[in-house]
Every structure is written in structure tokens, then in C-alpha cells.
Amino acid sequence: MLAVGLLGLSAVIVPAAAAQPFACTAGERPLRFGFYTHFEPVSYSDSRTPGSAGFDTHRGYEADLLSALEAIEGAKLAFSRRGIAVWNGIWLLPAGSEFDIVGGGITILESRTRAADGKAAVVFTAGHIAFRQSLLVRKEDANRLARHGKLSGVDRVGVLAGTTGEARLLEITGIAGAAGVLAVGTRVVTPRGRVVADGGAGYVIAAAGASPSLAGRRQIRPASAGLPTVIVFTDDAEMVEALADGRIDAVARGEVGNRAAAREHGNAFAVTALDARAETGGFALAARNAALAACLDRHIGWLTDGGRIGYSEWFGDASVFMQRARQAAVGKR
């Protein structure tokens, strides 16, 4: 599973014939792990302000999973963690020189493995968490907006730019096709003015990225009067606040984040419109470090018991991954 001489980690990765087959590194330096700071409870920091005390303090589901990886005897895994506040293109950062691994509730998509030139840039580990898209609505609207199909032209739906929540909402409602191409006549409000989609490849909003002309988009107004207006946010807390004060009628986002917001706001919100399509989240590494990804897969597979332990189990007992790590250390593996 392990390889020699991976570019950028050649001093860290050990050969396949090494005496410790579980070792992912030579233990000479920590792996530089960048984590998204705004996805509570999956991946977040003590402080959302870059440069402040606590910004690089990793919390949540993925933080505990990483700590358990570090605790596996013989794996030789250590992570130096740094917070990342900007979501857009976060999965491509390991292709550069600043990070070895990046996480933050990133949905695994083949389209996210390629750079802008179409060349392979990153690989993902196997999935360690499952997501489903959903709507977060005010409790009094739960019946009216029980399904995506009930959204109408009077509704305004919030999304986070560049997420699967945005891309999937556009696809489900028919504002865009499966590849993210916007329907003819769709109007997009950007800082540079309004653009109108012609149904071609120059007007795309997908989870892996969007057309340059749509950068910084603020609103997506469908050509059909019967479809909802999409309000684009860059901060999830601001988006939930907009739902609370009535500026929008729903938040299109993964179930995990929406249920966390519903819990935080007591009886004010409800989660509806659970998507039948499942998504899986993993960690991103440079394509040249595929062997490291494979080694991580081995240990993540143990910690998650082959996918049987995930977010729900962690939410019930946040020590579940560390318990598995200790079992590995005492030879129960």
C-alpha cells in the first residue's frame, strides 16, 4: 500500500517493505493539515477570525477522527493543523506547497480532483462521513416546504457559494442541468452587473466551480416565474440569520449542518426535503501522494469499522474513534 519517493513527502513516506506495515510516514515531521473553519459540527475552529487566538484550534467530527489517527500505534501519523476560512476551491490546496492534506466536510467528486486545466491535481481518501442535501425552514413552513418540488416563485432560498448544496438545489429545481449548465434565460446578479445565461457551457455553476462570469454571484433568478430565487451567501451563520429574520424562506444545505442549526435555534426551524441522493465526504491530498491516501484509508477504515461508524455514532459518543484507536493499539485489530 505504501510507496517510495512521493514528491513533496519523500522524506516522510516509508517503503512498502518497511518493518512497520501500518506506518504511513517515517515520523520525521507532522503532515500539514488545513481544515475549513466554518462547518460546525463537522469541522470548525474555536474562533472564526483568521489570525486570532483559537483560529487554528480544530474542533468537531473530523478533528476527533484526526486525533484518533494520531493515536493509532505504529501508524506514525501526526498533523499540524491550520484553519482555512475560505471555502472556494479548498480541495485543490494540497496540489500546492502549503498543505499535505485538506478537510472540512468536503464531498468527494471526481470533478473536484482536477485543476482548471483539466489535469489531475488531487485525490481523495475513501469517504468517512455521509451527507444528504436538505432544506432548513422556519417551523411554520415545514408542511408548505416539505419537498424541493414545493418551492415556488414566491420563495427565496439561501445557498453557500461553491458547495454541493448550491449545485444540487439548482439541479433539483431545474434551474441548471446535471452538469451545472444554467437554463436559458436564467439571470445571475454579480458585482459586475447582471448576466443572462444562454443555455451554453459559458454559464455553469457546479460543485467543482463556476464560470468566471458568475464569480461573486449574489442572486440566481430563474427564467420560470414558478421557480424560487436563489440567494447566494459566503457565510453560513449569516445565511441562517437571514432565515430567522425572514429575508429568505429556506436554506439548501447538507442535513448535518441544517440539523445542527435547528438544534441551536430550539423550536424555530425544521429540516425538510431530505434528498434521496447520498454524498460522501473525505480528505483531499495531492495526486502525487496517492499512496499516503491509501494508507490513510486503511486506518480510517478501521476507525469507522468499514463505514459502520460515522457521524451519528460520533454525535452520540464523541470518543468513539479514540476507542477504536486504542483497540488497534492493544492488538484487537
Model-inferred region functions:
Residues Y36-F39, A126-A142, T190-V195, A223, ...:
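Periplasmic-binding protein-like
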Residues A78-A95, N143-R144, G180-G200, A223-E241, ...:
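Short helix-initiation/N-cap motifs at beta->coil->alpha
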Residues N88, G105-D117, G200-A223, A237-R277:
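A ligand-binding cleft/hinge motif common to bilobed small-molecule-binding domains
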Residues K76-L151, N267-R277:
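Acidic, polar ligand-binding/catalytic clefts
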Residues F22-C24, D56-R59, A63-E73, V137-E166, ...:
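Extended ligand-binding regions for polar small-molecule ligands
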Residues L160-G180, V184-V189, G266-A273, I300-R333:
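Ligand-binding clefts/hinges and TM-proximal coupling segments of bilobed small-molecule sensing domains
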